[in-house]
Amino acid sequence: MNELAYLQTMPKQTALLKTHCADFVVKEQLGYEMSGDGEFVAVKVRKTDCNTLFVAEKLAHFAGIPAKNMGYAGLKDRKAITEQWFCLQMPGQPTPDFNQFQLDGVEILEVTRHNRKIRTGSLDGNHFEILLREAQEDADLKVRLENIKKNGFPNYFTEQRFGRDGHNLTQALRWAKGEINVKDRKKRSFYLSAARSEIFNLIVSARIRQGLHHKILVNDILQLSGSHSWFHADQKEDFNLLQQRLAQQDIQITAPLIGENVQIASDVENEIIAKHQELLYLMHQEKMKSARRPILMQAQHLSWSFIPEGLKLTFYLPAGSYATALVRELVNINE
């Protein structure tokens, strides 16, 4: 992450993140309400310093079902206070009495039924409440906050995506070179995700360094902010109009998540991907579907206050975007 370009400049201050779990609060928001009936038992949980997979296994064991019959919208940070939904597939079975469920760091907030499985893709986004300890109120930090509110921040994948010390990316590169064979399904998924996240980050960083993060290029693939559908900015388009729409946040410039049939739009993308052909080949070999992702992200409802302990932030991000990518534009972090 240190080598990736900043949208502003490298921060001047250093702050502490996640000194305590309460310094990093995440509340997920699904894209729908629970139906109240159906074959799935939906359980809303508040967990402190707990791994998502660990809690899922304990809930499944309590309900007497296989862990594979559990569902959730995504993995949440361990060193944090997080609220998220789990679902248990229990057709024709009564709802367990979760008042009897006991696990350190876990509180059951709500239990209901639902008519479909909660899975990746169910998540609309996450609300964040973050305390950056030891951050000092000064003019530079205030300008950074205002710039993020106005212009957004690089939509980088951050350290969580790459594993401890970049282990997932290292393993993906070894796999691509034929040095290892990966049989475990979850590891395969983690390694493939890390590999294409790395390519995405490099492309975003290159565009920022070249001053192209707010400039639409011929053949760029743009995303409509409302529907999230894509279209090509080919030579027939009115580029002055496209730039106006970009400034109004009606459209967004995207970069690729490489996979099968990846559409390479600009010379910047071509140049980066050409240097990582072994990873592109691995994506084809594993039949990963290609996708696109906005290169910049706008934090919704961003607000802040300086308190004696440091800087307190609250904001909302759509699914897939990382709060630590926003924080990176503000301060250097000691965890």
Curated annotation (Swiss-Prot):
Residues covered by the TRUD domain: 152-308
Keyword Nuclease (UniProt): no
Official protein name in the record: tRNA pseudouridine synthase D
Task of the protein: Responsible for synthesis of pseudouridine from uracil-13 in transfer RNAs.
Any one GO molecular function term: RNA binding
Record GO biological process: tRNA pseudouridine synthesis
Chemical reaction(s) catalysed: uridine(13) in tRNA = pseudouridine(13) in tRNA
Lineage of the organism: Bacteria, Pseudomonadati, Pseudomonadota, Gammaproteobacteria, Pasteurellales
Keyword tRNA processing attributed: yes
Enzyme class, UniProt record, top EC level: isomerase
Source species, domain of life: Bacteria
The entry's keywords: Isomerase, tRNA processing
PANTHER family in UniProt: TRNA PSEUDOURIDINE SYNTHASE D
Catalytic residues as annotated in Swiss-Prot or TrEMBL: D77 (nucleophile)
EC number: 5.4.99.27
Classification via InterPro entries: PsdUridine_synth_cat_dom_sf (IPR020103), PsdUridine_synth_TruD (IPR001656), PsdUridine_synth_TruD_CS (IPR020119), PsdUridine_synth_TruD_insert (IPR011760), TruD_catalytic (IPR042214), TruD_insert_sf (IPR043165), TruD_pseudoU_synthase (IPR050170)
NCBIfam families in the cross-refs: PRK00984.1-4, tRNA_TruD_broad
SUPFAM superfamilies: Pseudouridine synthase
Family, similarity comment: Belongs to the pseudouridine synthase TruD family.
Any single GO CC term annotated in Swiss-Prot or TrEMBL for this entry: cytosol
Gene: truD
